[in-house]
């Protein structure tokens, strides 16, 4: 087989970011009910996102109908692309989904957060043909050097979305249905009534700062909280900072004087 470089395409080993849907039970009725409950408050949040089904948390001897789980995820508008399984879980290929390898970007939490669901995107690797060119070295920065802070000084209305490769500063209101996303920190010097997602590539040190917190959803590194879990009175509508501590969102009053 010739490895001569083609001017028309490249085929190489690589990695892509995707969500992991970790299955912890074989009770598909309970799983379906919980999935619907989680998504009914924010049906658009994961719409069209790719997801890998992770069955490594199942006990020895347990198995699930992956075709049914695949359909469940499709029903909430997610796109299953593969399965992550242990070597002993040979049944995981029965649904026709490819087996993938996953490298979690953080150690697994000892206990799930009471008010947030971890959905951080690990790197999922798919094997490919030998590359004609070298691939990036492991540990290389995933974000270009010298990324500048993005400043938005206009109101964001329902349906609008802003994405920042680094930090994001917003100087005007974020309305219901609007979404602001950053790979770094988010600063909002106005009311936040839409969705704010910081550290979206797994940056657990990212924070959200806001002078008036009234959000539909807040998220750091994929750990999120929605309006189905009302905010305490001491932070609702107030100046706050939001950070992660042991897989839990901490929302703290921000005293500016």
UniProtKB/Swiss-Prot annotation:
Q: Where is the composition biased (Low complexity)?
A: 123-141
Question: From what superkingdom does this record's organism come?
Answer: Bacteria
| BP term (GO), one | regulation of cell division
Keywords for this protein? Cell cycle, Cell division, Septation
Q: Where is this region: Disordered?
A: 123-144
Decide whether keyword Cell cycle is in the record. Answer: yes
Query: How would you summarize the oligomeric state and partners of this protein?
Result: Interacts with MinD and FtsZ.
Chain's role: Cell division inhibitor that blocks the formation of polar Z ring septums. Rapidly oscillates between the poles of the cell to destabilize FtsZ filaments that have formed before they mature into polar Z rings. Prevents FtsZ polymerization.
* Protein name (Swiss-Prot/TrEMBL): Probable septum site-determining protein MinC
Organism of origin is: Burkholderia multivorans (strain ATCC 17616 / 249)
Q: What does the organism's lineage look like at the top?
A: Bacteria, Pseudomonadati, Pseudomonadota, Betaproteobacteria, Burkholderiales
